[in-house]
Amino acid sequence: MVRDGVVLTAPNLGHEGWHRFDLAGSLTARLGKPTRVLNDADMQGLGAIRGRGLEMVITLGTGFGTGLYLDGRLLPHLEIAHLRFRKGETYDERLGNAARKKIGDKGWSRRVQKAIDDMRRLTNFDHLYVGGGNAKRLTFEPNPDITFVDNEAGIDGGAHAWLD
């Protein structure tokens, strides 16, 4: 989780040195240029959303990322990955790349559909964007209020982060 350029937690990186590390400040000092640091799902969302209503982004890659936006504005710090999902395991454990490899794309896609149902109940989103490196492996057709996005949305989101 990143807040105001500071990495609060990064359990997926496996090193305590990231805990409360001012990444934006460190990069700015070393590069001599202003920097912005965002969660990857937040950044992808900035490049994907339309700015209408409550929009949510989930990213499927090494783990499970989430971002939430209201009328085009990021509502930061939504971190669902480490919450319990099913069978005592977290969203990351059940939906991450290791789980996909273990059970295959079809079984993993069913899990993702259950997670989407959870996110719908939790947020009552108007639109959901699904991205990340493994989104292309999903085996179901999305509902009309769900859009699959490619990783270029993250690059676009990086540019959008500077518009505020």
Question: What are the language-model segments listed below?
Answer:
Residues 89-129, 133-164:
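Adenine-nucleotide phosphate-binding core of ATP-dependent small-molecule kinases
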Residues 39-41, 60-62, 132-133:
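Fold-independent oxyanion-binding glycine-rich loops
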